[in-house]
Amino acid sequence: MIRDICRDESFLAQKAEPAAADDLGTAQDLLDTLSAHGDGCVGMAANMIGVNKRIIVFDNEGEYMVMLNPVIVKKSGAYETAEGCLSLAGTRKTMRFQTIKVQWQNERFQTRLKTFTGWTAEIIQHEIDHCDGILI
């Protein structure tokens, strides 16, 4: 189901709770909402649709990917960039890393570990910031 975008900064600033099996519907809602905003959005976190759970979805080189309970376990190659967000007006400067290693669970709650680089790494960092209550 396509959900409305949350723009309440006090809600967005809350740290997300871990995702569980009964949150898989939220993951599907995120995919539906991201797809509906695909012309100007490349990733979303659950708090962007008003759900305080640690779930992100993003465009992984042309295919949408879901991460439950993602955590960055390694990062390198710091750089400064400016990003925008559906939940916030305008663009803002932030620090990102060229290469990140992420641990997460897939939709079957199997633990995964993968290294991401470049644009995909930047998207993931932005969405994990949402999960951590960090507003760019």
Feature map (PLM): residue ranges:
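Positively charged
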Residues: 1-136
